[in-house]
């Protein structure tokens, strides 16, 4: 089976925060799992280097947009790598390859009659002497009356036109823009109304889209899909490939999602492999992002794919809700965030991954708390998982000189592990990652209870053969926990694999155990709870 996984493209205008990772982490879990199953996986993403936010940041810092994009693209690559993300292709939207692919898609839509020209009114700043891109216009949402940008309201998820905003102002200088006429290209989105409606109905029947994606898209369909501009007067981006319009750029909402397509083509060129199997309608596709990106993946991207004649549209939409920080809405402008480069300097990446999975905003907003983060590490990763691994392997090191005791796999334990693989695999495929991880840790707690009830420290003297059986089965459990947890906690799983000399990485029970165990090291270190206050002081002290 071919599996295509697309992770949303973060804007290269500032560091990643935990909200980004909470929404993107499911993609890596899926990729690792399906590779272990032996499926043909293509997992792609990249940095959005063309968006208006990059131009704004560059202007604020007095540097070029390219310098800003380069800085954060490199930082993103480093952060994703250090967190264990296994993208097959992580690229950027200002690459020549991406520009060519997007322009080809634009021309194909134009040829098929899905794009047309239209004279429209647009916000114009007399002070800045320029037409304002949608993100350059700020004001009040006409629907929920919260602060909003000209393209979308984050509060109610409404897709907006800048002219819809109340109390409009230029983001650059704060003045009230005038309204002037200009010509733009439009995408005939309304022509895909029935196909999008059918896609939502199928997703509802199969449960392959998150509830928030279904509800929001149903709302858009009920209101009637409106044609959207596909060109804008932007300072950076992909030029319109039509003579006389080269000074205009392809609007980022259609250009950025086409990044999945361009990344796929780039991967094919780089590897010499064929990517057609990921776009022929037979592939299982997953699109992973936050709920603010729902309309771009449930409406815009399917319409683009249908418009260019591709056989597949998003089958699974994994759209997480928001992550708050210490019960407050995350705000990059106010510096109320936990920044990824910062937290990676001091904490194990598996600790970060674990917390963001068991507290994932899968169906509702969830909160990142420094207290809960540190206590979950100490009680679950160290106290439950690390404790079971460490006391089992240390027992072998101390009483058997590192030689693996002889034994046979307990039939009941074998059955339990086989059922666990099936249950966890099904949960992952259904994008219920929290359920999957919690199921494994239920088994870890069972393993600790098994160790305590068998009392190998007493069996060693009273019944040495039973003691060997106990420890043998504990190692069997450890080997399989490492395999089951690899999609979630890859770094600690790798440490266990190295200790146990496990080569097989397939998604199946591990029955081959090592003959010898050397150099046993703690799987996790305890985090001093005093760090809670230190982190809170740092967080509150950095607020703008």
Curated annotation (Swiss-Prot):
InterPro entries: aa-tRNA-synth_I_CS, Anticodon_Met, Met-tRNA_ligase_1, Met-tRNA_synth, Methionyl/Leucyl_tRNA_Synth, MetRS_core, MetRS_Zn, Rossmann-like_a/b/a_fold. Its main location: cytoplasm. ATP binds at residue 332. Keywords: Aminoacyl-tRNA synthetase, ATP-binding, Cytoplasm, Ligase, Metal-binding, Nucleotide-binding, Protein biosynthesis, Zinc. One of its GO terms (cellular component) is cytosol. GO terms for molecular function: ATP binding; metal ion binding; methionine-tRNA ligase activity. Its cofactor is Zn(2+). It holds the Pfam family tRNA-synt_1g. A motif ('KMSKS' region) lies at residues 329-333. One of its GO terms (biological process) is methionyl-tRNA aminoacylation. It catalyses: tRNA(Met) + L-methionine + ATP = L-methionyl-tRNA(Met) + AMP + diphosphate. Binds 1 zinc ion per subunit. It is found in: Cytoplasm. Its EC number is 6.1.1.10. A motif ('HIGH' region) lies at residues 10-20. Signal peptide: none annotated. Zn(2+) binds at residues 141, 144, 153, 156. CDD domains: Anticodon_Ia_Met (cd07957), MetRS_core (cd00814). Monomer. Belongs to the class-I aminoacyl-tRNA synthetase family. MetG type 1 subfamily. Is required not only for elongation of protein synthesis but also for the initiation of all mRNA translation through initiator tRNA(fMet) aminoacylation. This is Methionine--tRNA ligase 2. The lineage of its organism: Bacteria, Bacillati, Bacillota, Bacilli, Bacillales.
């Amino acid at each position: 089976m071919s599996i295509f996984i697309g992770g949303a493209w973060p804007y290269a205008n500032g560091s990643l925060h935990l909200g980004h990772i909470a929404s993107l982490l499911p993609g890596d879990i899926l990729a690792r799992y399906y590779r272990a199953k032996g499926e043909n996986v293509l997992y792609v993403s990249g940095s959005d280097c063309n968006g208006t936010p990059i131009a704004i940041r560059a202007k604020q810092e007095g540097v070029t947009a390219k310098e800003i994009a380069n800085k954060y693209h490199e930082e993103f690559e480093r952060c994703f790598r250090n967190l264990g993300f296994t993208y097959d292709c992580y690229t950027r939207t200002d690459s020549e390859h991406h520009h060519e692919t997007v322009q080809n898609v634009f021309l194909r839509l134009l040829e098929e009659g899905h794009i047309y020209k239209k004279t429209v009114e647009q916000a114009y700043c007399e002070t800045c002497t320029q037409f304002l891109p949608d993100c350059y216009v700020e004001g009040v949402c006409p629907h929920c009356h919260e602060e909003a940008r000209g393209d979308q309201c984050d509060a109610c998820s409404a897709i907006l036109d800048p002219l819809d905003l109340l109390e409009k102002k230029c983001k650059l200088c704060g003045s009230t823009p005038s309204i002037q006429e200009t010509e733009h290209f439009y995408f005939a989105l309304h022509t895909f109304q029935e196909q999008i409606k059918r896609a939502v109905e199928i997703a509802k029947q199969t449960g392959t889209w998150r509830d928030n994606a279904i509800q929001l898209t149903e709302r858009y369909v009920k209101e009637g899909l409106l044609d959207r501009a596909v060109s804008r007067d932007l300072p950076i981006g992909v030029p319109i490939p039509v003579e006389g319009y080269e000074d205009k750029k392809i609007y980022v909402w259609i250009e950025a999602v086409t990044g999945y397509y361009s990344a796929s083509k780039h991967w094919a060129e780089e590897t010499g492999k064929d990517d057609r199997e990921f776009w022929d309608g037979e592939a299982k596709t997953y699109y992973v992002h936050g709920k603010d990106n729902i309309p771009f993946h449930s409406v815009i991207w399917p319409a683009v794919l249908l418009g260019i004649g591709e056989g597949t549209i998003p089958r699974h939409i994994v759209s997480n809700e928001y992550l708050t920080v210490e019960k407050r809405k995350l705000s990059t402008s106010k510096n109320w965030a936990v920044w990824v480069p910062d937290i990676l300097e001091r904490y194990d990446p598996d600790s970060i991954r674990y917390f963001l999975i068991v507290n994932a905003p899968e169906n509702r907003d969830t909160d990142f708390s420094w207290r809960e983060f540190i206590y979950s590490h100490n009680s679950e990763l160290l106290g439950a998982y690390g404790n079971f691994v460490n006391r089992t392997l240390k027992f072998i090191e101390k009483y058997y000189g590192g030689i693996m005791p002889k034994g046979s796999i307990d039939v009941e334990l074998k059955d339990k592990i086989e059922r666990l693989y099936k249950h966890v695999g099904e949960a992952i495929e259904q994008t219920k990652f929290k359920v999957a991880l919690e199921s494994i840790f239920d088994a870890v707690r069972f393993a600790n209870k098994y160790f305590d009830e068998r009392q190998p420290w007493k069996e060693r003297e009273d019944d040495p053969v039973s003691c060997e059986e106990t420890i043998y089965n504990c190692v069997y459990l450890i080997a399989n926990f490492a395999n089951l947890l690899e999609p979630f906690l890859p770094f600690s799983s790798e440490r266990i694999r190295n200790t146990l000399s496990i080569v097989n990485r397939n998604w199946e029970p591990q029955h081959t155990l090592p003959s010898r165990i050397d150099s046993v090291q703690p799987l996790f270190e305890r985090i001093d709870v005093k760090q809670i206050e230190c982190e809170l002081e740092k967080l509150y002290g950095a607020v703008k």
